[in-house]
């Protein structure tokens, strides 16, 4: 018996003038997510998804490309003003912020929300290269 064909609903363009940019910069990758003020994802991009593999994902240029891609998609949804939350110690933090600024967004605020332990978990052992 043949299964009924499923119709795929096309994503509708939401009109979101104000949003939040979450930049998560780890040592291995950078993830840029544009959300509305309630936290619902509008667009996202990462250095790995942008075509960079291996150690090139952790470069500032890869973070810049990822931020530009996510910003372009967010602008298609009508986003103009953003607040920026930055998390993590990675090298792509500044480059991603600069790319968001250069994309033509009005930046309302920039906050660093990197979690800092009050002597929590034991860190991984030091690398000997």
Swiss-Prot record:
PROSITE patterns (alphabetical): RIBOSOMAL_S11
Q: What InterPro entries would the database entry show?
A: Ribosomal_uS11, Ribosomal_uS11_bac-type, Ribosomal_uS11_CS, Ribosomal_uS11_sf
Q: List the GO terms this entry assigns under cellular component, sorted alphabetically.
A: ribonucleoprotein complex; ribosome
GO molecular function per UniProt: rRNA binding; structural constituent of ribosome
Its function, per the record, reads: Located on the platform of the 30S subunit, it bridges several disparate RNA helices of the 16S rRNA. Forms part of the Shine-Dalgarno cleft in the 70S ribosome.
Signal peptide (residue range)? none
Q: Which UniProt keywords apply?
A: Ribonucleoprotein, Ribosomal protein, RNA-binding, rRNA-binding
Family label: Belongs to the universal ribosomal protein uS11 family.
Keyword Ribosomal protein listed? The answer is: yes
Q: Name one GO biological process term.
A: translation
Q: How does it assemble?
A: Part of the 30S ribosomal subunit. Interacts with proteins S7 and S18. Binds to IF-3.
Q: What Pfam families does the record point to?
A: Ribosomal_S11 (PF00411)
Coiled-coil regions, chain positions: none
- Residues passing through the membrane, by range: none
Query: According to the entry, what is the taxonomic lineage of the organism?
Result: Bacteria, Pseudomonadati, Thermodesulfobacteriota, Desulfovibrionia, Desulfovibrionales
Can you name this protein?
A: Small ribosomal subunit protein uS11
């Amino acid at each position: 018996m043949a299964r009924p064909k499923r119709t795929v609903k096309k994503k509708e363009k939401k009109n979101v003038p104000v949003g939040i940019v979450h930049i998560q910069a780890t040592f291995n990758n950078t993830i840029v997510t544009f959300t509305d003020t309630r936290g619902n994802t509008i667009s996202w991009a990462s250095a790995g998804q942008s075509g960079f593999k291996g150690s090139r994902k952790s470069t500032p240029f890869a973070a810049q490309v990822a931020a530009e891609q996510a910003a372009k998609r967010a602008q298609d949804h009508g986003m103009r003003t953003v607040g920026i939350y930055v998390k993590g110690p990675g090298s792509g933090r500044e480059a991603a912020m600069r790319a968001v600024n250069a994309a033509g967004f009005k930046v309302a605020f920039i906050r660093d929300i990197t979690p800092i332990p009050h002597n929590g978990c034991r860190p991984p052992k030091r690398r000997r290269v």
